Amino acid sequence: MLTRLREIVEKVASAPRLNEALNILVTDICLAMDTEVCSVYLADHDRRCYYLMATRGLKKPRGRTVALAFDEGIVGLVGRLAEPINLADAQKHPSFKYIPSVKEERFRAFLGVPIIQRRQLLGVLVVQQRELRQYDESEESFLVTLATQMAAILSQSQVTALFGQYRQTRIRALPAAPGVAIATGWQDATMPLMEQVYEASTLDTSLERERLTGALEEAANEFRRYSKRFAAGAQKETAAIFDLYSHLLSDARLRRELFAEVDKGAVAEWAVKKIIEKFAEQFAALTDNYLKERAGDLRTLGQRLLFHLDDSVQGPNAWPERFILVADELSATTLAELPQDRLAGVVVRDGAANSHAAIMVRALGIPTVMGADIQPSVLHRRTLVVDGYRGELLVDPEPVLIQEYQRLISEEIELSRLAEDDVNLPAQLKSGERVKVMLNAGLSPEHEEKLGSRIDGIGLYRTEIPFMLQSGFPSEEEQVAQYQGMLQMFNDKPVTLRTLDVGADKQLPYMPISEENPCLGWRGIRITLDQPEIFLIQVRAMLRANAATGNLSILLPMVTSIDEVDEARRLIERAGREVEEMIGYAIPKPRIGIMLEVPSMVFMLPHLANRIDFISVGTNDLTQYILAVDRNNTRVASIYDSLHPAMLRALSMIAQEAEKHGLDLRLCGEMAGDPMCVAILIGLGYRHLSMNGRSVARVKYLLRHIDFEDAQTLARRSLEAQMATEVRHQVAAFMERRGMGGLIRGGL
């Protein structure tokens, strides 16, 4: 072994560059020790973390850094103790830290030794193997000797120079909620984690049943409390998330299996981990996106149960005065319990646009980025800038950059104040043209009441949300009451109710739909025409609710063909006759329109003029289908861009055909509330925009500061562009010249 050791040291010492030397080292150690994995972690004392610099056997992701904080994992423990650690099964050690990207879950045996030169820790040298065994004394001695030789070869200056490429200061992510935040990164390390729970048994099953019962009750009370809190604050969609958690927690089968596991002798924590993971894996194996998302909800339940089984609770004074939360994953419950007055922003390593957490941060107005490919522990206690407009994270930026972002935040605050000052004025262009600014709504009228004076009506009422909150289909009477509240609240303004739009990422808990390709499957009008009794009950409820107000428009979702329109109209007319027979007098006729979100209907507009009264362009799905991109898939989400030239040309074609055939034209996707898109939409001919409440003030402010001819010129130039980046540069210049760059620019 001494000969082999000398050969390795000589080869490493003769390598021209340090990174090449490290690759030689890990390869030759694997061969010499006949082990499956060898890795070198070098210590960055400025950042207080280890970087995985070279490995043979683990997966080192291309283009990204794998880092561990000094106090994290068994590698961190080796460094802190400054002595070897030899384990037969590393995954059972309390310090074990699972890093999914390196694929080390197959390996059990672990031997780590520190690399120390003149009392200065340079790094940690690690070998691993699948077999459950401790490395023998000769192997440990070999690795310790090699680490000592490596310390003599390495210098701190060499290591520091190598870190330049790993000290990422600007990290690309996905924008989840707009805005800019500057604060200290903070990871809540006190929260009990599922991966830290190991198998354990007890003889006192009655005590464990009592503990489990208490945790279930506390979690249920917590969900009810959060639901009431957010409902009282007019954040009904956020409240609905906790109603869903309560529904999952009350599942009889889940509770039965939890208690059965305890009765077999498991401690409550192990029962929670085993059963929750079992249920979550069943959901995760499904192809349907919505059902896959329920796997995450179940794990959230598990985390909360572990939290209530644990005595160590994060106190309110433990949080910094102002912080940016950094986390691997984010749950709505975690967000709800954070001190909102201290939370400046959020950075999440994993996450999707349709997750409950993403919905909630947007509702709360917290600047957020998701898919930030860096370990949260590396960001802990470091100065961060979150740019929720561009989807960027800056780590320890230079003071001049911090000053610039602070200026942008001040500008953003001032623009918001100006927008609020004018929000009750009409949405009128500088050149005099009126634009209708409508609201996208989803729950009870109380949620939208306070916006009544700011908007011109309800452009989209998502009727599926009340359906999703119940354990079965709501009755006709329940639906009448729901729709009546909205129609009467805005009795002097138009209200558009969309018929039930479920399927794909929106599922009813009592009507699960599992498909291989749900986005292109059984959803929207396809479901309700296949099951006309659901459609008839809902339309009758709408017509009855409209009998006294006469301000109803009915919107049909996911229409693909003319025959679907004809069949839906036939059923609506039938429902009208049934209602008139029921109440004994004629009722107002609603306006009928389609949600234009399937590309096929773009080419069928000439045939719709004598069948419907209006079209409402759903830009979210239309963009998705035109670009063939699943916007909730983090791997391809960056391709999704509503300002893609193909999408703009489709919108232009729709506007021209609608005007030619006398169809009332509306738009209700995210583009309607995005200041980056509004001027182009106006230039293309759109005069009816429906958006979320948080966007109303800014959009109205923007509209009052642009001229129609200028918007037309911008739209014409955008249609000539070949790439979305060209369009965005044109819009940015347009907005900057008019002093409104702060509406679209959160970063540099």
UniProtKB/Swiss-Prot annotation:
Residues 1-127 form the GAF domain. It is found in: Cytoplasm. SMART domains: GAF (SM00065). The reaction takes place in three steps, mediated by a phosphocarrier histidine residue located on the surface of the central domain. The two first partial reactions are catalyzed at an active site located on the N-terminal domain, and the third partial reaction is catalyzed at an active site located on the C-terminal domain. For catalytic turnover, the central domain swivels from the concave surface of the N-terminal domain to that of the C-terminal domain. Phosphoenolpyruvate binds at residues 462, 498, 620-621, 631. It comes from the Bacteria. Its cofactor is Mg(2+). Belongs to the PEP-utilizing enzyme family. InterPro entries: GAF, GAF-like_dom_sf, PEP-util_enz_mobile_dom, PEP-utilizing_PTS_enzyme, PEP_util_AS, PEP_util_C, PEP_util_CS, Phosphohistidine_dom_sf. Residues 128-170 are annotated as: Linker. Mg(2+) binds at residues 597, 621. It comes from Salmonella typhimurium (strain LT2 / SGSC1412 / ATCC 700720). Residues 171-748 are annotated as: PTS EI. GO terms for molecular function: kinase activity; metal ion binding; phosphoenolpyruvate-protein phosphotransferase activity. This is Phosphoenolpyruvate-dependent phosphotransferase system.
